Regions:
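RNase III-family endoribonuclease catalytic core
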Residues: 1-111
Length: 111
């Protein structure tokens, strides 16, 4: 398979894994968020604008997809947790969402 096709395939799977993670994560941290707010947060999670803060969005999704195909769903979720969650929380707070995430400082300086 040519590298571009492999990248697209990995990204396609990674996009699905990210969507599953985002929905699960939003339900776990749900603090009375309205369904409208939850939908807006989900859209932010999977947006190219957010993903581009890490690099080219397709490459970010492909990295998630590779974690999934090589080591399974738990590994892919861990990859997202370790690499994307803190910045997502910061981005959401900058947009006016008051996310209280267990185990994370309210105004974390990490990016």
């Amino acid at each position: 398979m040519d590298p571009e096709a492999k990248l697209r395939n990995d990204a396609w799977i990674g996009d699905a894994v990210l969507a599953l993670f985002a929905r699960s994560w939003l339900l776990q941290i749900g603090q009375g968020e309205s369904s409208r707010d939850r939908n807006r947060l989900f859209e932010l999670w999977v947006s190219n604008q957010f993903l581009s803060s890490f690099g080219e969005p397709t490459s970010v999704e492909a990295a998630i997809g590779r974690a999934y195909t090589s080591a399974g769903l738990d590994a892919a979720f861990m990859f997202i947790e370790e690499n994307l969650v803190d910045r997502f929380v910061q981005t959401a707070r900058k947009r006016g969402f008051n996310l209280a995430v267990p185990g994370r400082a309210k105004n974390s300086a990490r990016s």
